[in-house]
């Protein structure tokens, strides 16, 4: 838009430069020009001002916004600051903090929202963007690629069969449900009598099956009968191997790692093995009271410690004293 305004401004400037030459024509042409209206209406720019300011002083600002406001000065709908129609309406209603002004602003906002919704309904690009956002397959394209392989797995037929104990339990459950349903429907006692011996038979069969299975297990443990699996079947499965996704680094502040409750710091003790014991006596980083406590904890007297510390230097000093002075020749 700004480039368009600047282009119009350049065209208008070039027209104004050629304006004096056009004025040198016949007086009849000048009278015809004076009779023309001050506004020139066009499809693209309905409010183009013919009396555009000739000098630089007449312009509001040299910015494109100032050029645009000067170019469309005669349009009553366009104004900046307190001269805008919306600002004047708010002042007429009593200011921003009044209820009427708030209602007016809410109505304006609602109108803008409705206009935006209508434009979105007309826009094909907006509809396409919504469809892409709702389509879950669009996210899979952006994600890591997946490779699908067919794998052959050989499984014995016994694994597909349900265990015998589970089959008997299922049969018992079915018969119990049938009996309960018969009692709910208040059937005759003869029907109940017909169903109950069957259940007893099934229960006996189940008990026999349990004993048979226990006997088989005992035989297998003893080694009397060995279990031989039947022929294996091949099952084709589609296995999808997902590629490893890159772990996104979580940006966190160093204060987030701290615990909510303050950590109790261990108190510094002088009586134990601390850094104070590693320093020499002259470079002890504390006052005399702390130094005295350190010596008391070690079980030595401060004067003895000083003597021990200065002992090698005193020996050297005594050795130098005992040497005979060399006489100069």
Curated annotation (Swiss-Prot):
Annotated InterPro entries: DUF5520 (IPR040721)
Compositional bias (Basic and acidic residues): 213-229
Transmembrane domains' residue ranges: none
Phenotype upon gene inactivation: No visible phenotype. No effect on testis size, testis-to-body weight ratio, germ cell development or spermiogenesis. No effect on sperm morphology, count or motility. No effect on levels of germ cell apoptosis, chromosome H1t histone association or acrosome biogenesis.
Region of interest (Disordered), residue spans: 16-41, 183-229
Tissue distribution of the protein: Expressed in testis and epididymis. Expressed at lower levels in ovary.
Protein purpose: Dispensable for normal development and fertility.
PANTHER family named among the record's database cross-references: MCG1612 (PTHR47509), RIKEN CDNA 4933402N03 GENE (PTHR47509:SF1)
Name of the protein in its database record: Uncharacterized protein C10orf120 homolog
Organism: Mus musculus (Mouse)
Lineage: Eukaryota, Metazoa, Chordata, Craniata, Vertebrata
């Amino acid at each position: 838009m700004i480039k368009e305004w600047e282009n119009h401004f350049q065209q208008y400037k070039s027209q104004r430069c050629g304006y004096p030459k056009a004025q040198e024509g016949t007086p009849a042409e000048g009278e015809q020009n004076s009779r023309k209206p001050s506004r020139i209406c066009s499809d693209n720019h309905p409010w183009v001002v013919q009396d555009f300011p000739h000098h630089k002083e007449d312009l509001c600002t040299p910015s494109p916004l100032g050029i645009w406001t000067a170019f469309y000065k005669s349009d009553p709908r366009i104004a900046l600051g307190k001269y805008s129609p919306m600002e004047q309406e708010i002042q007429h209603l009593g200011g921003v903090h009044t209820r009427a002004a708030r209602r007016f602003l809410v109505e304006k906002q609602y109108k803008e929202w409705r206009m935006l919704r209508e434009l979105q309904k007309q826009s094909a690009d907006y509809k396409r963007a919504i469809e892409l956002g709702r389509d879950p397959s669009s996210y899979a394209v952006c994600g890591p690629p997946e490779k699908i392989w067919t794998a052959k797995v050989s499984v014995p037929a016994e694994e597909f069969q349900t265990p015998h104990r589970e089959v008997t339990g299922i049969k018992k459950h079915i018969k119990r449900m049938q009996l309960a349903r018969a009692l709910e429907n208040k059937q005759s006692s003869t029907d109940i009598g017909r169903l109950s011996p069957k259940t007893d038979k099934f229960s006996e069969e189940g008990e026999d099956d349990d004993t048979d299975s226990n006997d088989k297990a005992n035989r297998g443990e003893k080694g009397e009968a060995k279990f031989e699996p039947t022929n294996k079947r091949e099952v084709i499965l589609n296995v999808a191997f997902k590629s490893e996704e890159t772990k996104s680094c979580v940006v966190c502040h160093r204060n987030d790692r701290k615990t909510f409750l303050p950590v109790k710091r261990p108190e510094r003790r002088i009586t134990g093995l601390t850094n104070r014991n590693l320093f020499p006596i002259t470079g002890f980083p504390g006052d005399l009271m702390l130094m005295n406590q350190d010596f008391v904890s070690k079980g030595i007297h401060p004067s003895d410690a000083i003597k021990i510390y200065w002992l090698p230097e005193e020996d050297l000093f005594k050795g130098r004293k005992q040497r005979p002075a060399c006489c100069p020749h």
